[in-house]
């Protein structure tokens, strides 16, 4: 069981350190293009990826980079940096440039595409876990901890909250209250691999 809270994880150095341990599969770009709402594609789709990223500074060779817009900046501004760090494909809501040096997939909703690809890459761990989400203004952490301890006597559980991420066999500090979907899928995959059957999140 894995506990997921309303304030979930994003990625810190501690979370990024788990990337190599996470059980993710390799996906072909053609497979990705078929499972998301594509507007157009550019370049070769006969390329496999095993890592997805929304921060150009954390791109590693072979990454799929999602260019996501935000309140203060826009991921499209950092496509060149992502390419310099080894990205092999970009997924964005913006049209592909006329001379992109790498593959490019334009979608209607980049965040929806990120969610769909993340679930696919990490083997849809949410389908194999009993998930409990705890929301509210105050008391989420307390309720989550109590719930985990109550159910923990019957099954191995995981907890993803504002204080830390308990993955069943280890505890790491949480960096942010709300995680991006690819980090959440990665953590759920790790919890599942560690033998958890339930997850609590607040």
Predicted regions, residues:
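Phosphate-binding loop of NTP-binding sites
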Residues: 114-202
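N-terminal leader/targeting and accessory segments in enzymes
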Residues: 1-116, 120
């Amino acid at each position: 069981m894995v506990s997921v809270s309303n304030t979930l994880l994003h990625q810190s150095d501690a979370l990024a350190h788990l990337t190599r341990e996470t059980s993710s599969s390799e996906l072909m770009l053609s497979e990705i293009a078929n499972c998301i709402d594509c507007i157009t594609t550019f370049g070769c789709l006969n390329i496999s990826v095993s890592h997805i990223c929304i921060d150009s500074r954390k791109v590693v060779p072979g990454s799929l980079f999602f260019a996501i817009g935000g309140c203060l900046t826009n991921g499209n501004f950092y496509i060149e940096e992502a390419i310099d760090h080894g990205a092999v494909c970009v997924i964005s809501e913006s049209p592909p440039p006329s001379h992109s040096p790498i593959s490019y997939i334009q979608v209607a909703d980049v965040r929806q595409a990120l969610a769909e690809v993340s679930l696919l890459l990490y083997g849809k761990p949410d389908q194999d876990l009993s998930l409990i989400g705890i929301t509210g203004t105050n008391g989420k952490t307390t309720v989550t901890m109590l719930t985990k301890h109550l159910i923990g006597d019957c099954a191995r559980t995981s907890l993803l909250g504002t204080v830390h991420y308990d993955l069943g066999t280890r505890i790491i500090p949480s960096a942010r209250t709300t995680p991006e979907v690819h980090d959440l899928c990665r953590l759920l995959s790790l919890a599942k691999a560690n033998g958890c059957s339930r997850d609590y999140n607040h």
